[in-house]
């Protein structure tokens, strides 16, 4: 587990939070610009001046103001990946990777052996073996970030910090690096704090989520639960939707479709070449869900889920509301007009049919 109790006071900003985060997987730190995301990472790394509180990673205490403990950054077992790759331009990829291991390579033979093994593992995990002899200016943005991540994990850190690592990449390069980050998440048995303001990155990569706004924690928890809490900034706007974990339950070869089964029903989506039993994540956006009070007949919408209304909450626009639906163990969002809610006489607890017009495979 990660235990964070952090307080940073500035003239125009205050970061004050207390968190307990999982000891494995990706925790997304989400929020608008100026919410304190990067300040949180810098505090964990020991880079913020005058920070107070307690930082404990597993059994290791990195900071405890009351006990007078505050380890300098170089004594904290962490890897840090920034928006820009920060590779040394005069060194090749291989030389950049080895540069970070100099301290370990000066130690005992056993430490040297372990360091070399970790370096080779990071090269394989990030798929950069063919890039080792290239110079940084010969790499694409996505390749540079993969090298930077490999350099960070080669030191076998207890904690990996990533500060918007995809922010400087164009859409094509972001899509290129997503699978590598997912592999990293699944292969490493360490916690990762991942700062982002991208809902796509959250849904594709994160296991846990913290929502920050103006230096305060607005929500935290498993990502699928946080994404359906209508009081959170993350569900405001066109990106509002549910993240559902399931598996491929069946294939329809004739129509090139795959069925995704989950605790609450199933939906059909276009075949992505996945095999039956494969674990997947799907996203259903609130704007793609409509409701009916009886089972729809003679409709082109193929995905229909039995549900009950959990809540009806005003949306930022006065013409709309956000409806939270319970589908078995899962929650689904639907953005409707107030007129539709009035005409259908929808109310909390009412059974309905949710018609899902579109499903996105995110992982």
Stretch-by-stretch model annotation:
Residues 61-64, 111-131, 182-183:
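Conserved ABC ATPase "signature" region
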Residues 62-79, 103-106, 110-116:
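ABC ATPase NBD coupling module
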Residues 135-139, 143:
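Conserved ABC ATPase signature
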Residues 154-158:
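A short, proline-enriched helix->beta-strand linker immediately N-terminal to the Walker B motif
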Residues 160-164:
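Catalytic Walker B motif of ABC-type/P-loop ATPase nucleotide-binding domains
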Residues 182, 186, 196-265:
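Internal alpha/beta loop-helix hairpins
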Residues 266-313, 331, 335-363:
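Glycine/charge-rich catalytic "coupling/switch" loops of P-loop NTPases
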């Amino acid at each position: 587990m990660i235990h964070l109790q952090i307080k940073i006071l500035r003239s125009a900003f205050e970061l004050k939070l207390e968190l307990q985060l999982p000891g494995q997987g990706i925790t997304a730190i989400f929020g608008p610009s100026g919410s304190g995301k990067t300040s949180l990472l810098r505090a964990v790394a020991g880079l913020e001046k005058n920070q107070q509180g307690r930082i404990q990673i597993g059994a290791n205490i990195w900071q405890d103001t009351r006990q007078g403990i505050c380890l300098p950054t170089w004594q904290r077992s962490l890897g840090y990946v920034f928006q820009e790759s920060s590779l040394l331009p005069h060194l090749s990829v291989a030389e950049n990777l080895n540069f970070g291991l100099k301290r370990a390579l000066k130690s005992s033979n056993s430490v040297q052996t372990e360091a070399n093994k970790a370096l080779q593992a990071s090269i394989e995990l990030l798929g950069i073996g063919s890039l080792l002899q290239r110079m940084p200016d010969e790499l694409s943005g996505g390749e540079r970030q993969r090298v930077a991540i490999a350099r960070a994990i080669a030191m076998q850190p207890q904690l990996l910090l990533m500060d918007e690592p995809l922010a400087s990449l164009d859409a094509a390069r972001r899509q290129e690096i997503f699978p590598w980050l997912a592999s990293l998440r699944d292969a490493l048995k360490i916690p990762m704090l991942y700062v982002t303001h991208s809902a796509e990155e959250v849904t594709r990569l994160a296991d846990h989520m913290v929502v920050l706004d103006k230096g305060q924690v607005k929500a935290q928890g498993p990502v699928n639960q946080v994404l359906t809490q209508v009081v959170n900034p993350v569900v405001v706007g066109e990106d509002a939707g549910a993240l559902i974990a399931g598996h491929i339950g069946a294939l329809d070869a004739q129509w090139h479709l795959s069925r995704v089964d989950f605790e609450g029903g199933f939906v059909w989506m276009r075949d992505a070449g996945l095999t039956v039993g494969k674990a997947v994540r799907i996203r259903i956006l609130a704007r793609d869900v409509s409701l009916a009070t009886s089972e729809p007949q003679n409709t082109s919408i193929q995905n229909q889920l039995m549900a009950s209304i959990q809540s009806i909450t005003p949306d930022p626009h006065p013409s709309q509301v956000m409806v939270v639906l319970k589908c078995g163990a899962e929650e689904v969002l639907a953005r409707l007009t107030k007129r539709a809610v009035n005409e259908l006489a929808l109310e909390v607890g009412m059974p309905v049919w949710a018609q899902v017009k579109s499903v996105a495979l995110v992982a």
